[in-house]
Curated annotation (Swiss-Prot):
GO terms for cellular component: cytosolic large ribosomal subunit; preribosome. Gene3D superfamilies: 3.10.440.10. It comes from Eremothecium gossypii (strain ATCC 10895 / CBS 109.51 / FGSC 9923 / NRRL Y-1056) (Yeast). This is Large ribosomal subunit protein eL31. Keywords: Ribonucleoprotein, Ribosomal protein. It comes from the Eukaryota. Pfam families: Ribosomal_L31e (PF01198).
């Protein structure tokens, strides 16, 4: 399992509007966080999903009920360097700043390792 295929970074557009339809106003931002974690878990196949603090700021920027309709996310599957880690890989989700998230497709991002 330890190869280049296990570490990858992709950019996704997630439609939060359809995932939060019918959710009570006071539960929209917390549910958005849960939905993003669920999305990352599904697409990256990792149990351990970690969110960047900037992503949390983007979700909560307009308050608990003003969650953006769509968000552009960069999800990285990384190796877990901790000793006695339960999972060998984890996903790290961070926001990507774009003018409009409409019409964008999933892109594999080539990362420069320094």
């Amino acid at each position: 399992m330890a190869g280049l295929k296990d570490v990858v970074t992709r950019e996704y557009t997630i439609n939060l509007h359809k995932r939060l339809h019918g959710v009570t106003f006071k539960k929209r931002a917390p549910r958005a966080v849960k939905e993003i974690k669920k999305f990352a878990k599904l697409h990256m196949g990792t149990e351990d999903v970690r969110l960047d603090p900037r992503l949390n700021t983007e979700i909560w920027k307009r308050g608990v009920k003003g969650v953006p309709f769509r968000m552009r996310l960069r999800i990285s599957r990384r190796r877990n360097e901790e000793d006695n880690a339960k999972n060998p890989l984890f996903s790290y989700v961070e926001p990507v700043v774009v003018a409009s998230a409409k019409g964008l497709h999933t892109v594999v991002v080539e990362e420069e390792e320094a």
